[in-house]
Amino acid sequence: MADIHIEEFYKDAAIALVQLYSAFPRRINLFVEDIAGPDEPDEFGLHSKRHMACFGALLWLEEEGLLRYVDTIRQEALDQAVLTQKAFVRLSTPASAGLRAQLEALAPRVQDQLPESIRQDLSTHIHLIRNALRSGSSATISQVMQGAFFGGTCALTSDH
């Protein structure tokens, strides 16, 4: 994917959703620096483009009905954020067979010997997102997020 800002969006959204899922149903403060890394405002008090892009991604997740929050803490965090029912259900459900097959082709797993209940848990969108984040591959993160929230998958090539 040539658009770095889109890759960063997918990664920011993935990290935020994993943090919220891990705390669900508790409300948490979702800090931009915990997602995008440290940022020092410039001499005018303005944050970097990267910081603001991450903050924008968090606001977009709310606008699209994937999270709720009580207020913003300046442009640094969302106060009392929690997943919506829509996001919780989506993250908890198994991914499509097509998406799982594409990911398994990249990194074959030995899941056939596992009990069905464990295989189902390992096939959920949240598990695939966590694995994609652990891989560090922007292409894999993008593919998993597209499959989980945008209903499509793209052919995965190599990461840059």
Stretch-by-stretch model annotation:
Residues 4, 46-49, 71-79, 98:
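Short acidic, glycine/proline-enriched loop segments that cap or flank alpha-helices
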Residues 59-75:
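A short, conserved structural fragment
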Residues 79-113:
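Short, amphipathic alpha-helical interaction segments positioned at domain boundaries
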Residues 20-24, 61, 90-94:
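Generic structural signal for hydrophobic core residues of well-folded globular domains
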Residues 107-160:
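Membrane-inserting effector segments that mediate pore formation, membrane fusion
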Residues 2-46, 52:
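Short amphipathic alpha-helical interface segments
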